[in-house]
Amino acid sequence: MIMDPLEPEASHPSVFSSGYLIFRHSDRPQFLLMRHGDRWDLPKGHLDDGETKKQAALRELEEETGLTSSSIWTDPEFVFEHRYWVTPRGGATKRALKELTIYLGFLLQDRAIECTEHLGHQWWNWAPPHRIQVQTIDPLLESVDRHLQRSATARSMLKLG
């Protein structure tokens, strides 16, 4: 868990978000990012009442990409949790501690992505280290890189040997 050292006294998140990092193997391993305004992001979103983090992640994945739970394999050995500060929408001035949970998924077969909530999407070649977005994407990809070095199953899904 990564915490912002500027405000260590706040330890209880008030905003929760959950999503997926999706990989595919085309000619080489690639991961999916969604275009969100002037930045790249993951298919993710806030939890609905009564949802688990995993249920929210799968719902958001389907809503934002058209990918369903049956079209991916979820790595049971990887969950990325990250806390950081956000300014809530709606004109609020007080920052809130957000907890982001990301699951790692692999496409079982190539499928078209149906962008419904983003300007577009892009498959990025897996060639660490990546420098895409310092607050959430880069720490996630660093964690995935460490996981891939340890997990034979995840490496085999990407045909990394």
Q: Residues of each region from the PLM?
A:
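Acidic, metal-coordinating catalytic segment for phosphate/diphosphate chemistry
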Residues: 1-20, 25-27, 92-93
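A short, highly charged, low-complexity intrinsically disordered segment
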Residues: 4-7, 149-161
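Residue-level signal for short segments within beta-strands and strand-turn junctions
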Residues: 22-24, 35, 106-107
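Conserved Nudix-box catalytic region and its N-terminal flanking loop in Nudix hydrolases
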Residues: 27-70
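Short aromatic/basic micro-patch
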Residues: 41, 97, 123
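Active-site segment of metal-dependent pyrophosphate-handling enzymes
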Residues: 67-111
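NUDIX/MutT-family hydrolases
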Residues: 102, 106, 111-146
